Amino acid sequence: MKPVFLSSIFASLVVASIAAASEPAPERQKELVRMVRQDCGSCHGMTLNGGLGPALTVEALKERDIPKESLVATIVGGRPGTPMPPWHRFLSESEADWIVDRLIEGFPQQ
C-alpha cells in the first residue's frame, strides 16, 4: 500500500474515534436527558419554554442566536450573579456540548 493511502486511513480512524469519544454512551444519554428535563426544567420550564430562566426551545435559541460555544460555557461554568449554577461537577464539557446539540435540534422527550 502507498504511504498516502495508509495516512488517509489512519486519519479517518482518528477522526472517527474522536467523534465517538464525544458522544456519551446510550445510558448516559438517558441520564443527561433526565437531568435536563428535571434539573434544568426547574428553572427553564418542564417543557423548556422558559420560567425563571430563558426558554431553551429550538425557536428561542434561533431567535437569540447565541453561539454554541457560549451555551456550552454557560452550562459548564454557570453565570455568576444569576441563578444559573455551574454544572461542571455533574457533567463534562463534551456532555454539555451533546446537550446543546440536542437543544439546537429539538430536545428529546425521554
Language-model-detected regions and their locations in the chain:
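Positively charged n-region of N-terminal signal peptides that target proteins for export
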Residues: 1-4
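Charged, solvent-exposed alpha-helical segments that act as regulatory interaction surfaces
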Residues: 49, 108-109
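Short amphipathic alpha-helical "recognition" segments used for binding
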Residues: 6-7, 35
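Extracytoplasmic electron-transfer domains, predominantly the class I c-type cytochrome c fold
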Residues: 58-108
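Electrostatic cytochrome c docking/interface patches
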Residues: 16-35, 110
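Bacterial N-terminal signal peptides
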Residues: 7-16
